[in-house]
UniProtKB/Swiss-Prot annotation:
Belongs to the radical SAM superfamily. Biotin synthase family. [4Fe-4S] cluster binds at C85, C89, C92. Binds 1 [4Fe-4S] cluster. The cluster is coordinated with 3 cysteines and an exchangeable S-adenosyl-L-methionine. Binds 1 [2Fe-2S] cluster. The cluster is coordinated with 3 cysteines and 1 arginine. The gene is bioB. Its EC number is 2.8.1.6. Pathway: Cofactor biosynthesis; biotin biosynthesis; biotin from 7,8-diaminononanoate: step 2/2. Gene3D superfamilies: Aldolase class I (3.20.20.70). GO terms for biological process: biotin biosynthetic process. HAMAP family: BioB. CDD domains: Radical_SAM. InterPro entries: Aldolase_TIM, BATS_dom, Biotin_synth/BioAB, Biotin_synthase, Elp3/MiaA/NifB-like_rSAM, rSAM. It comes from Gloeothece citriformis (strain PCC 7424). Residues 67-302 form the Radical SAM core domain. This is Biotin synthase. It comes from the Bacteria.
Length: 359
């Protein structure tokens, strides 16, 4: 691995042609194994104007093609238990501290319902199906609770009855619980850091950023791929975004969901303006510069924030996306997503994890 240095310019050229050349040179170095520094990543945030941001996206797309190929990882999710969550995440409408106006409340869905939705997701083209539950996490469940056993049984059913790989997002968990999920058939688990370590206390106080990191480490120790990302548009600074991406690089996660905050009424962040689509594109592209081999996943908010520009994200470094509906909001149809991929010369399927891609 080529070691990082500060030899590259840290201020992008203002001239369009010079900027394009500078970005392509940096992209080529990253493709060859160079790890971009924080100073260089921050310099990319100084690029301004739609035309020049698109040049940044073009360079990020070159990195994606060289390091990941043209296959777009497709997954779908199901909210298996919703509402009355004990945590106070400012962005989430499922919190008991500030329930959103459009957040459903229900207990654990039946195994049959979950398996049927897994089959439907597979039929729609998804290759992975993630079981998502509210709450701080499995490690805090009562010893008398049967929920984990029910989830394990459902995961096993999905592996045998549906042509799709089961994933889970069940909050914090112990190493032993991670090992049990692995044995049941879970190969990837979603547990986002959400934000940088510095910004995190401004959006959540009922648990810590370090708590979340511990779970990611437990997943990796159990041999489960970490699907770990965050949210853009919560009022964080560019430096916060860079720090988040660098933390994900340090943790060597496999898949990185990039959520674009779609402010929900009733939540503490409900008053925030929606993120500018070109700022979102810039963030996506910079994440690709920092995380050249990781799966970068369009997650919540892509339709609401990107609108007609969402296809540009797939030319800015994205090589994965959720299809179908989200936890408490609706997404566009899988057929629309498949048509979008085809128009861009991309194919849905399973994208390679870091170190797997062979050109």
């Amino acid at each position: 691995m080529v070691q990082a240095s500060l030899s590259s310019p840290i201020t992008p050229p203002k001239d369009t042609q010079a900027l394009q050349e500078w970005l392509h040179q940096l992209a080529d170095r990253i493709i060859s194994g160079y790890r971009i520094t924080k100073v260089e990543a921050l310099a990319l945030t100084e690029i301004e104007g739609q035309d020049q941001i698109l040049l940044l996206c073009e360079a990020a797309d070159r990195i994606r093609q060289a390091c990941c190929g043209n296959r777009v990882d497709l997954c779908s999710i199901i909210n298996i238990k919703s509402g009355h969550c004990s945590e106070n995440c400012s962005f989430c409408s499922q919190s008991v501290h500030h329930p959103g106006q459009d957040s459903p409340v229900y207990g654990l869905k039946t195994s049959e319902e979950i398996v049927q939705q897994a089959k439907a997701a597979a039929a729609a083209g998804a290759k992975r199906f993630c079981l998502v539950s509210q709450g701080r996490g499995l490690k805090y469940n009562s010893p008398k609770s049967k929920e984990f056993a029910e989830i394990l049984a459902t995961v096993k059913r999905i592996t045998t009855e549906a042509k799709i790989k089961p994933c889970c997002a069940l909050g914090e968990l112990t190493l032993e619980q991670a090992q049990a999920l692995k044995e049941a058939g879970v190969t990837r688990y979603n547990h986002n850091l959400e934000a940088s370590a510095t910004f995190y206390p401004q959006i959540v106080t009922t648990h810590t950023w370090a708590d979340r990191v511990e779970t990611v480490k437990n997943l990796k120790a159990a041999g489960i791929q970490a699907c770990t990302g965050g949210i853009i548009g919560m009022g964080e600074s560019w430096e916060d975004r860079i720090d988040l991406a660098l933390s994900l690089r340090d943790l060597e996660v496999d898949s990185v969901p990039i959520n674009l905050l779609n402010p929900r009424q009733g939540t503490p962040l409900g008053h925030l303006p929606k993120l500018d689509p070109f700022e979102a594109l810039q963030a996506i592209a910079i994440f690709r510069f920092i995380l050249p081999q990781q799966i970068l996943r369009y997650a919540g908010g892509r339709e609401a924030i990107m609108g007609e520009l969402q296809s540009l994200g797939l030319k800015a470094g994205i090589n994965a996306m959720l299809i179908g509906h989200y936890l408490t909001t609706l997404g566009q149809s899988p057929q629309q997503d498949q048509a979008m991929l085809k128009s861009l010369g991309l194919e849905g399927g399973e994208a390679p994890i870091p170190g797997e891609y062979q050109p």
